């Protein structure tokens, strides 16, 4: 996870590394990157109450649980989060809420899933939540057109991992 070639680690590990460094009494400095920003950047405009209000404004026909609101809040407040959630815990609903937030803010979103069946499932779930998926979402796998004007691309990692960096430039958020 650490690259000796460039001296970098995955941003998702920063919290673990800083906790370890503090526990051991090490001093450290987190530098801001011109492309990625600061690894512990926060969005001070995001509040738990605001997240609840936003999700309720989506008019979902399903109940949203407290832990789902908390996960959505964490992702929006802290910009970079790794969410671990068990099967049937409503991950699609959490992802949908995050996607809707970003699309409402005029951001393009890339959703990466491990299998083609999950591309289809995510698309279907978004449709069941009442969104016009045909207008907003593009499914990308197994030879589908990679370049689209849709705001949201749902793809398998296998379909995009060999793409040049330029392919990813249009995306403002990756889930």
Identify the residue ranges that each predicted region occupies.
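SF2 helicase catalytic motif II
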Residues: 157-159, 165-175
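Charged, low-complexity intrinsically disordered regions
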Residues: 1-30
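Walker A/P-loop
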Residues: 63, 77-102
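Conserved pre-motif I regulatory segment
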Residues: 2-4, 20, 31-84
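Conserved strand-helix element at the start of the C-terminal RecA-like helicase core
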Residues: 86-87, 92, 108-119
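Hydrophobic positions in the central parallel beta-sheet of the AAA+
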Residues: 83, 111, 153-155, 174
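Conserved motor-coupling elements within RecA-like helicase/translocase cores
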Residues: 142-153, 167-171
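Conserved helix-turn-beta segment of the N-terminal RecA-like "Helicase ATP-binding" lobe
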Residues: 109, 116-144
């Amino acid at each position: 996870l650490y690259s000796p070639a460039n001296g970098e680690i995955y941003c998702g590990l920063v919290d673990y590394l800083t906790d370890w460094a503090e526990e051991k009494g090490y001093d450290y400095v987190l530098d801001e990157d011109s492309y990625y920003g600061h690894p512990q950047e926060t969005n001070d405009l995001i509040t738990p109450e605001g997240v609840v209000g936003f999700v309720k404004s989506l008019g979902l026909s399903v109940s949203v649980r407290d832990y789902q609101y908390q996960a959505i809040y964490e992702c929006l407040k802290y910009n970079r989060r790794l969410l671990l959630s068990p099967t049937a815990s409503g991950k699609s609903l959490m992802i949908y809420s995050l996607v809707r937030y970003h699309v409402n803010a005029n951001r393009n979103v890339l959703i990466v899933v491990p299998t083609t069946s999950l591309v289809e499932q995510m698309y279907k779930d978004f449709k069941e939540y009442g969104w016009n998926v045909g207008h907003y979402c593009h499914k990308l796998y197994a030879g589908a057109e990679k370049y689209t004007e849709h705001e949201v691309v749902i793809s398998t990692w296998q379909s995009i991992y060999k793409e040049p960096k330029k392919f990813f430039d249009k995306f403002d958020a990756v889930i």
